Amino acid sequence: MAREFSLEKTRNIGIMAHIDAGKTTTTERILFYTGRIHKIGETHEGASQMDWMEQEQERGITITSAATTAQWKGYRVNIIDTPGHVDFTVEVERSLRVLDGAVAVLDAQSGVEPQTETVWRQATTYGVPRVVFVNKMDKIGADFLYSVGTLRDRLQANAHAIQLPIGAEDNFEGIIDLVENVAYFYEDDLGTRSDAKEIPEEYKEQAEELRSSLIEAVAELDEELMEKYLEGEEITIPELKAAIRKGTLNVEFYPVLVGSAFKNKGVQLVLDAVLDYLPAPTDVAAIKGVRPDTDEEIVRHSSDEEPFSALAFKVMTDPYVGKLTFFRVYSGTLDSGSYVKNSTKGKRERVGRILQMHANSREEISTVYAGDIAAAVGLKDTSTGDTLCDEKDLVILESMEFPEPVIDVAIEPKSKADQDKMGIALAKLAEEDPTFRTQTNPETGQTIISGMGELHLDIIVDRMKREFKVEANVGAPQVAYRETFRTGAKVEGKFVRQSGGRGQFGHVWIEFEPNEEGAGFEFENAIVGGVVPREYIPAVQAGLEDSLENGVLAGFPLIDIKAKLFDGSYHDVDSNEMAFKVAASMALKNAVSKCNPVLLEPIMKVEVVIPEEYMGDIMGDVTSRRGRVEGMEARGNAQVVRAMVPLAEMFGYATALRSNTQGRGTFTMFMDHYEEVPKSIAEEIIKKNKGE
């Protein structure tokens, strides 16, 4: 099947915003106008086309980025809907990674909100060109020019209006297009009919002013245009459009549009702006990768002629077809039924079927081309961030980096019979979401789940109940402590049981020493002359390794120690492996009084990004959490504080940071190293764990 839309006529865009700015409604209207939906679903009634997971419909927020394809004026527009809640930043990160451009939706009443800052920063990191849509112009308190101002003040963005609303709140009637210099009035409720008319008299002066400041702003980015402008020559509409496009593609300029998605006003003009100002796959820099065996850099251009390469950016379990892997094709073509190489994992994969998704309905296609976004059925080993490529021409594309989970919670099924079902459910959910982990705690046998925040784990537990019919009880968040020795000593372990019949006899002398941090447990056999027969040596090592798991102070694993077996004795009849295993564990217990054992806690490397005015409060808060501030720097108009803080003190930090900064602060943290717990705190933990 030949390519339906040329690369130049393809747009891969994301729609990004703060919670409640109207992002899902905007996407919904785009699908309506591009002829994909027959009835419009409202988010507040819980029936939107993109929000297709039940929890999203209940909570009225978008959690998973569904990829949808639409057509407008002979172009193909692939849309990825991204969530706006801070606990789902991984979803935003991964969708930005595969997009070429984005539409940032703002609420006309509030302008730039906290999460807009976070998403905007992420988009800047990935160099994503953006157009801005100031939505909800029909809302009480809507103020377009104030919203444009917040883009400049809070984000230092070179943003300029390319439209002007006619009226506001209930009187919002139409839109003035400053580029074409015409006005659009909406005549029917669906906003499908809007006629271009002359700009009303009372708006002419303001429109003229805004148009000249727009021309001046783009002229600054384009020398030829600047000369024309300074000489007072007329700048034509095509020249102005080309200059806006150039500035937008270079991520130096952000055109701002206006409307009300809910009232069907301005959405078609947003679609026009996507075609006019956002990049085609051929406008963005070619993607770089490395050859798996030699690590030499390879460039893949957006072209059907190049070898196939794609990035898997989302894995989902679908109720009808099983595992769906969403991927973005960067180069080459792929037919369904063919084999590809997952170069990240070194596995061969068969692509069973290829589906193009439309929110929650789907269409099967036989071939995908460079620049396309689609979902594959049948991939067994591919997870988020993996590269899929031609078997004969391997490449690993720059992968996505995901933050480490920051919160651990113990979970158990409400009925014991569901234990296995819960294990399967958690494994499937972990496959979909790289920031969600699941493990079994060897000391307590509990299942521990880890994620990006409380809402994140709530949703996981919720999905388990809905999709896998497993109900669970969730515990309070916990910290993974460790133990180690600070000094060395020679210790004896003797196990003797000789009372009639076959006895038990095992006797060892072991020298314990602290090992380097991160070196783990090392065992050395220094027996000479067979005082402990060779066949019992592995039993001594096994006995030590088993006992290390449960520590000596408070039942946490003992790490980073050396053990040298140097002497002992045996009995011809009564000695056996079991006896030496027990003797070794007794030696470890006896080491407690001589080797100065201490408790270690995970120390997190924390990075907090906040507006300058909250600097003092945040520094004080970090210090009160036993944190050490390691450094500070300015990033745009925000301040970054880097610190080392014990994980035990970081519980509830997301909530505290939100309230300390009115939701404008964000933070990331990951495990850095283990450090000794201060004595007074260690005593408390030991008491608690021994049940005293």
Curated annotation (Swiss-Prot):
GO molecular function, a single term: GTPase activity
SMART domains assigned to the protein according to its UniProt record, in alphabetical order: EFG_C, EFG_IV
GO BP of this protein: ribosome disassembly
PROSITE patterns: G_TR_1, G_TR_2
Domain tr-type G intervals: 8-282
Residues engaged in binding GTP: 17-24, 81-85, 135-138
Keyword Cytoplasm belongs to the record: yes
Subcellular location: Cytoplasm
Chief location of this protein within or outside the cell: cytoplasm
Keywords: Cytoplasm, Elongation factor, GTP-binding, Nucleotide-binding, Protein biosynthesis
A Pfam family: EFG_III
A GO CC annotation given for this chain: cytoplasm
Entry function: Catalyzes the GTP-dependent ribosomal translocation step during translation elongation. During this step, the ribosome changes from the pre-translocational (PRE) to the post-translocational (POST) state as the newly formed A-site-bound peptidyl-tRNA and P-site-bound deacylated tRNA move to the P and E sites, respectively. Catalyzes the coordinated movement of the two tRNA molecules, the mRNA and conformational changes in the ribosome.
Family: Belongs to the TRAFAC class translation factor GTPase superfamily. Classic translation factor GTPase family. EF-G/EF-2 subfamily.
Protein name (database record): Elongation factor G
Organism whose genome encodes this protein: Bacillus velezensis (strain DSM 23117 / BGSC 10A6 / LMG 26770 / FZB42)
Gene encoding the protein: fusA
